[in-house]
Curated annotation (Swiss-Prot):
Function of the protein: Specifically dimethylates two adjacent adenosines in the loop of a conserved hairpin near the 3'-end of 16S rRNA in the 30S particle. May play a critical role in biogenesis of 30S subunits.
Name of the protein described by the UniProt record: Probable ribosomal RNA small subunit methyltransferase A
Gene3D superfamilies assigned: Ribosomal RNA adenine dimethylase-like, domain 2, Vaccinia Virus protein VP39
Annotated S-adenosyl-L-methionine binding sites: 12, 37, 58, 83, 100
Organism: Methanococcus maripaludis (strain C6 / ATCC BAA-1332)
Primary location: cytoplasm
Amino acid sequence: MRQSKKLGQCFLKDKNFVKKAINRAEITDKDIVLEVGLGEGALTKELAKLAKKVYVIELDERLKPFADEITSEFENVEIIWSDALKVDLKNLGFNKIVANLPYQISSPITFKFLEEDFETAVLMYQYEFAKRMAGKPDTKEYSRLSVAVQYNADVEFICKVPPSAFSPKPDVNSAIVKLTKRKPKYSVKDEKFFKKVLKALFQHRNRTIKRALIDSSHEIEIERDALKEILEKIESEFDFTERVFKTPPEKIGHLSNLLYDEL
């Protein structure tokens, strides 16, 4: 079958990386696992051998022959023919996620996952995206994505995966990442506003926090002059001279709360 470029289909073929992903997920016969993207079923079959139940969300119905083969062999596999971004995940009751994700939905599907109550997720991403997810302050990888994902999950970069592991071969390297869901290490008063602050700051990651906020005041929906007044009011409570890319997530959370209190 010819894979769909529109759907970003690159099927994982290398069994070594399939095995590595499953091993890091530590699947047991008590686990209910969610997979996004069936492919030719290489990952699905291995999950089905270990898990209590495997839900697979797949959009491309041309893959039904692979699905039929798998469901005839494994009674614990259920295929959901739909767009993963539109499926209500709350009723599935999964506790783990293992998937070779379509790269064009990496960001939205990851944040959709993070809204759910799961234990661990072992996911395949484009290499550069994976590095940014795991980015730490004062590194080139540290980004809005780093702070947003690490707000309620620990991110572990497991390994780099070469194009030769897939069919067809993608133009970029990939990586396996493990997310371990947890409670936030710091509190924010309004998560939506916090995300707006992140967007405003990281549009200018090399600037000082004060300059970045003023230049992107529209992102937090505060008029520029009004924001300047707010920053002057709270400058005794925060160091606005620090560069965005050097500022730890918990300090950004504190900044978000200070700003939110002034709205």
